[in-house]
C-alpha cells in the first residue's frame, strides 16, 4: 500500500515546481492571428519575432499576417486551413535587426556589410559558413517563451527583422522578412513540420519526398501523382 504522506509530498513538490515556473517565466502578449478551433484539436502554429523592438511590434504583427496569408494560399496548406490555428508572441528585442558577422565565404555583395544587433533570440546569418543560413543561437530562450506563453505549440516560425534573404529549417522554421519571406516560410516548413528534404541533392538519407523507386506507381506519393503537377 502506498503511503499517503508520500503522495502528499509529491503533490506539494509538483505544485511548488509549477509555482516557481509561473514566477520565473516571462509572459508576453500573444495575438490570435487565425483561430479555427480548440488548441487540443488543431495544428497550432506559433510565430516568434527576433530583432523587432517594442516600437516595431505593430510591424511584426503586420509581417506575420502577410506570411500567414501567403502560406495558406499555397497548396497543400490552403486545402487544410481549417485544421490550423496561428498565434504570434510579441517578444521585443533591445535592438532592431540581426547579426551578420561576414564570416561566410559566399557573402558576395554583402561581404563588407557587417553588423550586429542585441536581439532576444540572438539570430545570425553566416551560420556554418553559409551566408543565407539564418538561425537563432539562443534556442533555449525560444523554448522558454513557448512553454510560458503557448505550451500547446506544434509548429514554430521565427521571423527575423531584416530584408536580407535567409532562413533555415530545424526545430524552428526561420526566415527573414525579405520579399521572398512567404516562399522561404513554405520551404522551411517542409523541413521542420513535414520532415521533407530539399529539392536538390547534396547528401543525407531517404526522406518522405525522396525515393530510389523508379516505378511511379510504387512511389510513396502515388496517391497524389499528377495532382497539381506532382510527378
Q: Which residues does each PLM region occupy?
A:
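Secretory targeting signatures
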Residues: 1-25
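Propeptide-to-catalytic entry region of secreted or membrane-anchored zinc metalloproteases
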Residues: 26-146, 180
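An acidic- and aromatic-residue-enriched active-site/binding cleft used to recognize and process polar
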Residues: 50, 89-92, 162, 195-199
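Short, solvent-exposed loop/turn and secondary-structure capping segments
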Residues: 58-59, 98-101, 168-171, 194-196, ...
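Short pre-active-site segment immediately N-terminal to the catalytic Zn-binding motif
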Residues: 59-60, 166-186
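Catalytic zinc-binding patch centered on the HExxH motif and its immediate surroundings
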Residues: 97-100, 139-175
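Active-site recognition of the HExxH zinc-binding catalytic motif
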Residues: 182-199
Amino acid at each position: 500500500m502506498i503511503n499517503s504522506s508520500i503522495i502528499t509530498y509529491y503533490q506539494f513538490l509538483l505544485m511548488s515546481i509549477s509555482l516557481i515556473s509561473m514566477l520565473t517565466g516571462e509572459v508576453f502578449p500573444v495575438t490570435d492571428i487565425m483561430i479555427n478551433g480548440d488548441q487540443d484539436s488543431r495544428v497550432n502554429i506559433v510565430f516568434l519575432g527576433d530583432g523587432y523592438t517594442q516600437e516595431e511590434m505593430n510591424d511584426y504583427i503586420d509581417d506575420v499576417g502577410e506570411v500567414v496569408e501567403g502560406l495558406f494560399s499555397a497548396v497543400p496548406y490552403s486545402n487544410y486551413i481549417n485544421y490550423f490555428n496561428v498565434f504570434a508572441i510579441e517578444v521585443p528585442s533591445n535592438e532592431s535587426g540581426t547579426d551578420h558577422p561576414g564570416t561566410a565565404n559566399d557573402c558576395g555583395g554583402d561581404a563588407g556589410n557587417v553588423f550586429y544587433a542585441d536581439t532576444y533570440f540572438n539570430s545570425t546569418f553566416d551560420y556554418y559558413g553559409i551566408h543565407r543560413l539564418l538561425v537563432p543561437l539562443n534556442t533555449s530562450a525560444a523554448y522558454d517563451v513557448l512553454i510560458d506563453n503557448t505550451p500547446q505549440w506544434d509548429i514554430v516560425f521565427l521571423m527575423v527583422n531584416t530584408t536580407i534573404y535567409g532562413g533555415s529549417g530545424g526545430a524552428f522554421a526561420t526566415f527573414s522578412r525579405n520579399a521572398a519571406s512567404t516562399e522561404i516560410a513554405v520551404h522551411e516548413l517542409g523541413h521542420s513540420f513535414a520532415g521533407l528534404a530539399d529539392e536538390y541533392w547534396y547528401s543525407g538519407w531517404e526522406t518522405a519526398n525522396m525515393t530510389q523507386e523508379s516505378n511511379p506507381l510504387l512511389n510513396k506519393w502515388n496517391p497524389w501523382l499528377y495532382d497539381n503537377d506532382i510527378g
